[in-house]
UniProtKB/Swiss-Prot annotation:
Residue(s) carrying Cysteine amide: C17
Domain notes: The cysteine framework is I (CC-C-C). Alpha4/7 pattern.
Single GO MF descriptor: toxin activity
Modified residues (Pyrrolidone carboxylic acid (Glu)): E1
Location(s) in or outside the cell: Secreted
Cysteines paired by S-S bonds: C3-C9, C4-C17
Family: Belongs to the conotoxin A superfamily.
Protein name listed in UniProt: Alpha-conotoxin In1907
Amino acid sequence: EGCCSNPPCRHNHPEVC
């Protein structure tokens, strides 16, 4: 996922990773 490889997004949306 793009979000999971983007640290700020991953931090804000851990449930998708």
